[in-house]
């Protein structure tokens, strides 16, 4: 659909569609440790979904589409959560820097993301075009229902 952007579609459906596109393309470089790692220190278990790396990459690409100039540190803030401390009060805890760095490096390998001269990463014109195309597909699929 012409004129449909990432902001116009449901974010969950978009991330699911983009993750499926990344997996189907087969070009995203996935580290070998993805099945054994936790996503943050406040998590108790590794993710149940075996395709979590594609979902995280899709979510990161969507975030960079909405707010460019985000780096590894800001991604750890976005994917942080509540650290439970037993009988002590809970506090905020950041996500894994290694996972955030590897996701951004994988997206750079696809030429969807590039380093920004002001710091952080930003979407390339090709990456923005891919995301808008997938948003159009999601909007067209929703229109049929």
Swiss-Prot record:
Summary of subunit composition and partner proteins: Component of the small ribosomal subunit. Part of the small subunit (SSU) processome, composed of more than 70 proteins and the RNA chaperone small nucleolar RNA (snoRNA) U3. Interacts with RPS19BP1; the interaction is direct and mediates the integration of RPS19 in state post-A1. Interacts with RPS19BP1. (Microbial infection) Interacts with Sin nombre virus nucleoprotein (via N-terminus); this interaction probably mediates the loading of the 40S ribosomal subunit on viral capped mRNA during N-mediated translation initiation.
Keyword Cell membrane: no
SUPFAM superfamilies: Winged helix' DNA-binding domain
Disulphide bridges, residue numbers: none
Modified residues (N6-acetyllysine): 23, 111, 115
Protein family according to the UniProt entry: Belongs to the eukaryotic ribosomal protein eS19 family.
Effect of residue 47 to L: In DBA1; affects assembly into a functional ribosomal subunit
Free-text tissue specificity from the UniProt record: Higher level expression is seen in the colon carcinoma tissue than normal colon tissue.
Subcellular location: Cytoplasm; Nucleus, Nucleolus
InterPro entries: Ribosomal_eS19, Ribosomal_eS19_CS, WH-like_DNA-bd_sf, WH_DNA-bd_sf
PTM annotation (N6-succinyllysine): residues: 143
GO CC annotations, alphabetized: cytoplasm; cytosol; cytosolic ribosome; cytosolic small ribosomal subunit; extracellular exosome; focal adhesion; membrane; nucleolus
Keywords associated with the record: Acetylation, Cytoplasm, Diamond-Blackfan anemia, Disease variant, Host-virus interaction, Methylation, Nucleus, Ribonucleoprotein, Ribosomal protein
Species for this entry: Homo sapiens (Human)
Modified residues (Omega-N-methylarginine): 67
Lineage, highest ranks first: Eukaryota, Metazoa, Chordata, Craniata, Vertebrata
Disease field: Diamond-Blackfan anemia 1: A form of Diamond-Blackfan anemia, a congenital non-regenerative hypoplastic anemia that usually presents early in infancy. Diamond-Blackfan anemia is characterized by a moderate to severe macrocytic anemia, erythroblastopenia, and an increased risk of developing leukemia. 30 to 40% of Diamond-Blackfan anemia patients present with short stature and congenital anomalies, the most frequent being craniofacial (Pierre-Robin syndrome and cleft palate), thumb and urogenital anomalies.
Name of this chain's protein: Small ribosomal subunit protein eS19
Acetylation found in the keyword field: yes
GO BP: antimicrobial humoral immune response mediated by antimicrobial peptide; cytoplasmic translation; defense response to Gram-negative bacterium; erythrocyte differentiation; killing of cells of another organism; maturation of SSU-rRNA; maturation of SSU-rRNA from tricistronic rRNA transcript (SSU-rRNA, 5.8S rRNA, LSU-rRNA); monocyte chemotaxis
Outcome recorded upon mutating residue 57 to P: In DBA1; affects protein stability; does not localize to the nucleolus; affects assembly into a functional ribosomal subunit
Function of the molecule: Component of the small ribosomal subunit. The ribosome is a large ribonucleoprotein complex responsible for the synthesis of proteins in the cell. Required for pre-rRNA processing and maturation of 40S ribosomal subunits. Part of the small subunit (SSU) processome, first precursor of the small eukaryotic ribosomal subunit.
Molecular function GO labels: fibroblast growth factor binding; identical protein binding; protein kinase binding; RNA binding; structural constituent of ribosome
Origin: domain of life: Eukaryota
């Amino acid at each position: 659909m012409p004129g449909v952007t990432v902001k116009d579609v449901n974010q969950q459906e978009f991330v699911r569609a983009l993750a499926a596109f990344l997996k189907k393309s087969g070009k995203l470089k996935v580290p070998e440790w993805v099945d054994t790692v936790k996503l943050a220190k406040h998590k108790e278990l590794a993710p149940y979904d075996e395709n979590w790396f594609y979902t995280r990459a899709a979510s990161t690409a969507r975030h960079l589409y909405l707010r460019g100039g985000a780096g590894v540190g800001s991604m750890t803030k976005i994917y942080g959560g509540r650290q439970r401390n037993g009988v002590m009060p809970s506090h905020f805890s950041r996500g894994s820097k290694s996972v955030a760095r590897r996701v951004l490096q994988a997206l750079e390998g696809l030429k969807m993301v590039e380093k920004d001269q002001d710091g952080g990463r930003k979407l390339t014109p090709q990456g923005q075009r891919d995301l808008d195309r997938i948003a159009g597909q999601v909007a067209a699929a929703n229109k049929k229902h």
